[in-house]
């Protein structure tokens, strides 16, 4: 299931993407709301992960936008170290669940 990661810190987005891709997930990442909207508008994303530093107003707006563009699951993230362990324990099970229709 194609996943979009939105986070305000590019280095953290890169770490999340590295783990997801290493584990076989199709994932893209951005740091800005407009970039996220453009990608979501293009379709094909089933999951949106929104990082903990994304402001409440942006978060709410993007959740609504994602729902309008076929995203099955929005995950609110609050990344903790070690990042790879967090991604594997928190994000990946939810992505798999969304992919299976759950």
Per-region residue spans from a language model:
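Ser/Thr/Gly-rich flexible loops in soluble cytosolic domains mediating phosphotransfer, phosphorylation
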Residues: 65-102
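Acidic, metal-coordinating helix/loop segments flanking the phosphotransfer/catalytic sites
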Residues: 31-45
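Conserved phosphotransfer microenvironments
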Residues: 50-65
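Short hydrophobic helical patches associated with two-component signaling proteins
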Residues: 16-17
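Conserved residues at beta->alpha junctions
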Residues: 7, 31, 52-53, 78
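Short hydrophobic/Thr-rich beta-strand motif most characteristic of the beta2 strand and flanking loop
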Residues: 24-32
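Conserved acidic segment of CheY-like receiver
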Residues: 1-9, 48
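Short alpha-helical
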Residues: 11, 35, 56-57, 82
């Amino acid at each position: 299931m194609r996943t979009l990661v939105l986070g305000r810190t590019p280095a953290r987005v890169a770490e999340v993407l590295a783990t997801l891709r290493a584990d076989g997930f199709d994932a893209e990442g951005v740091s800005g709301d407009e970039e996220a909207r453009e990608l979501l508008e293009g379709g094909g994303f089933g999951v949106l992960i929104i990082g903990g530093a994304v402001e409440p107003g942006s978060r709410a707006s993007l959740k609504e936008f994602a729902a309008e563009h076929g995203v099955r699951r929005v995950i609110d993230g609050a990344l903790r170290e070690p990042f790879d362990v967090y991604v594997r324990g928190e994000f990946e099970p939810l992505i798999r669940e969304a992919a299976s229709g759950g």
